[in-house]
Amino acid sequence: MATAQTVAIPVVDPYGSVFRLLRSVELPFSLFRVEDASEVEADAPFAILSSYGKADAAVVEELSDRVPTVVYAVQVRANEPAPLMRAMAYVSDRMPVGLIRDVITAAVERASKP
């Protein structure tokens, strides 16, 4: 499999806000936006799934059954538990940018190992 620096990661984001936030994180790989989880190819090395408010467990499960997935949550209330479900990792807009970058990069590296 290609190294993390040579892959393009799909970001499932119907509204585009998470995609814009991720561009500011300066990840060491390319990103491209899709509007629906069904648009992520089964051979994608990895995916980032946006979640506005509470994550949809069914969507997380469906996508993470096909490809390793990180959930990026925005607008989550502090008293709501992080719905990790079957995702590899979970990040939130409340986290520092450096930590978001570290969590996503580590998850991509884990997913790319044979």
Task: Please tell me what each predicted stretch does.
Residues M1-S30, P96, R101-P114:
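Non-catalytic signal-transmission and effector/linker regions of two-component phosphorelay proteins
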Residues V11-V12, L49-S50, Y90:
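Active-site-adjacent beta-strand anchor residues
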Residues L22-S24, V59-E62, A82-L84, D102:
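Short amphipathic alpha-helical segments
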Residues V34-E35, A73-P114:
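Output/docking surface of receiver
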